[in-house]
Regions:
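Short, solvent-exposed beta-strand edge segments and adjacent coil->beta transition regions
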Residues: 1-5, 65-69
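Terminal peptide-recognition signature
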Residues: 6, 21, 46, 87, ...
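Acidic/histidine-enriched, glycine/proline-rich intrinsically disordered or flexible terminal extensions
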Residues: 126-152
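Core segments of cupin and vicinal oxygen chelate
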Residues: 8-51
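Active-site-proximal beta-strands of protease catalytic cores
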Residues: 29-31, 52-54, 106-114
Length: 152
């Protein structure tokens, strides 16, 4: 196990969520499931693109919120589309600026690497146009960021 591992509290869906996340990420695997006397999953562990996670079925006392999100750094628009569409499916929700909530209530930021590249340029006016364009988006669209950067 890595030194720091996100630990996710679920009501009863830890195993279901783990299997879902493993299906969404191409480089992912189940690491283990520990079961209680009733045979139901108590804790789960899995890996998404080299990042280990643990999950716990512990009841409805705590819910996920926007204070903690999983940041997915995407190579291109196709990858943004893949993660966005998969994570909002079956009851997930879109939010602004590349944020979305999956059907288990976990928050994600689906961000193309181009956003940082375009915002980090040496021309503050161009960077501000990119920021202003992004602030109007739900899912981030790379082509629209580029248009804003170019002043179109």
């Amino acid at each position: 196990m890595k030194k720091v591992t996100p630990f996710l509290w679920f009501d009863t869906q830890a195993e279901e969520a783990m299997n879902y996340y493993v299906s969404v990420f191409k480089n992912a695997k189940v690491l283990g499931v520990s079961r209680g006397p009733d045979g139901k999953a108590f804790t789960v562990s899995f890996e998404l693109d080299g990042q280990e996670f643990m999950g716990l079925n512990a009841g409805p006392q705590f819910k996920f919120n926007e204070a903690v999100s999983m940041f997915v750094n995407c190579e291109d628009q196709a990858e943004v589309d893949h993660f966005w569409n998969a994570l909002i499916a079956d009851g997930g929700e879109e939010s602004m600026c590349g944020w979305c909530k999956d059907k288990y209530g976990l928050w994600w930021q689906i961000v193309p690497k181009q956003l940082g590249e375009l915002m980090g340029g040496s021309d503050p006016a161009r960077s501000m146009r990119v920021v202003n364009a992004m602030l109007k988006m739900h899912k981030i669209i790379v082509a629209d960021l580029q248009k804003a950067y170019d002043g179109k």
